Amino acid sequence: MKKILAFFLVFALAGAVFADEPSAEAKIAEFKGDAAVTFGVDLDTNRTGFKNEVGGSIKLNLLNGGDKSTTGDGIWGELKLKINAFTLQAKADKNVNLLTKIDDDDVKVEIDTAKIHIGPAYVGIKKGDLNYGSNFWYPNALNYKDGDDEYYNRTPSDKVKYDQGLVLGYEQKDLFKVETAFRSQKDTGKKLDKVEGVILPKDTEIKKGEYFKSVEGAHDNAKTDDVFDDAALVDPIPGKTDVKKLKATXAVFKRVMKDGDTNYWTDKYALGVYGEVKPIKDLRVAIGTAYVFGRLSGDKDVLKAVGDSDNRGDITFFTGAXYKLSLLEKFVVNPVVTYTLYADAKWNGANEKLXYPEXLKTSMLKTGVRFGWGEXKKSNSLLYDFXGKNTLVYDTNKEDKGDDKLLPGVSLFGAFDLVNKNIETKLPLMXTFYSGELVKGLNVAALVHANVAKDASEISRVVPGTVYAGRMTKAXYERLIGAKGLQIGLAASYDVKLNDITIVPAAAMLWTHGMLKGEADTRMTADEFKVEAKVDVKGVIQNTTLSVFWDEAAFGKGTSKEWTFGVKHDEQNYYTLKNGVFGLKAKIAL
């Protein structure tokens, strides 16, 4: 809190300097609250009870977000600073805290652009890795952009871990731009932070130098104390040389490292080239590639010792195209296609030279298209509200950092992994739909996600000794459902107006299916059906919503008929049933 107040004082004093840029203010942006009482019946236990809830929040804007840039023409330096809005929030169940999209109690000034312009040419002096294509987003009706989910949202080329240097570019606005990037790699050493004790279960796979038998051994990084080399504690794994598995549950110790000193003068370099052209309005085509030279100095023995630890010889490639075709006033067709490649060079100790494996590390083609009609003010779909953050296939457990608007329309997305025969086991397609204001009062959200590969199997590798080697169990069922290989969801609501009263019936259904193949065309399958429904009544009592609901209902079945992996098993079934909760609710909101 002291840091928050300190930042506020700094920006308050700077208010006269920043004009239309970030400015200090003290303004209440939101002040609201609600209280609710629910009477529910657990249909599984036939037990009843009340639940009281209160909520409230106040948001106080202390600093408007904004940016400030230098200007000029001819030969000039461009620097653009950005800062997020700075808001304090207090809730009924939480003390005052900082409310920004930044983690931790911190307000950061971001350097958005740093370039030296020479007419249409420029020299960029801001750090950045050579992973091209990060601004090619796949359109989606439900707009679930997660900041760390690059699978369903975007796919820039793989990072080569060279981010220091400069960029030489030439740009004609709205026509084209080309860039050549010269990057070097900094080396940040690691040093011991602390030693932690952990308990590892039987059959845990460990690597050399990862765990030690004593605190002293871990502290000193003693090779004689390495669990990996103790035949009494670990067994080798057939076909693997870099990992072994524990014979029994054991208490071991590990080294926790932290960053040490950083050396920027390493003689390690990489080169990248990127081009982007806009031949017609709203059409963008791009291509980019990078090559890692690695360490350039040193004799043969030095370079041999380095090997490919500096990513020497690696090649990355990106190409993509995006188009936004506007039809009439608010209809739009938005297709996007991207392809990324990464060739990972490996050091061949026998020949003492770099060589490329037969298979690429990455070879991925992705494409998506949206036919849409306008935008919505809502940030969550009804399907999201009913099913929750962790249940739906497209979301992760991290905070959503995407846009705060849904995109009415229908979208289709597909990903094609062209490495080896991966496409034979994993070929995801996803269709989504959001109605928006297509029909007044009607709100519909839907998704279909399926692995349509020829030999689709959500968990492609079965290891003897795991929950899959024997029969269908609760653990196997939950793992298969968690893989979310096939998911179909539908949610809908409709506003019924009766004079001053509004009745809003709503319901949602979500089917999730998982499957695992064994030998001789045998398989394990798991299915889960979730159903929820409610009716809200508004206007009978001022400022109050009356509801009747049925939620948390689910039925699931897992089966393994004549499942074969090593040995053949009889049919095994696992069932789960939740009748859910039925209840009445009254909520007063301000």
UniProtKB/Swiss-Prot annotation:
Its membrane topology: Peripheral membrane protein
Cellular compartment(s): Cell outer membrane
Principal cellular location given in the protein's record: membrane
Keywords: Cell outer membrane, Membrane, Signal
Signal peptide feature range: 1-19
GO CC terms in record: cell outer membrane
Role description: Major component of the outer membrane.
Protein name: Major surface protein MspTL
Gene designation: mspTL
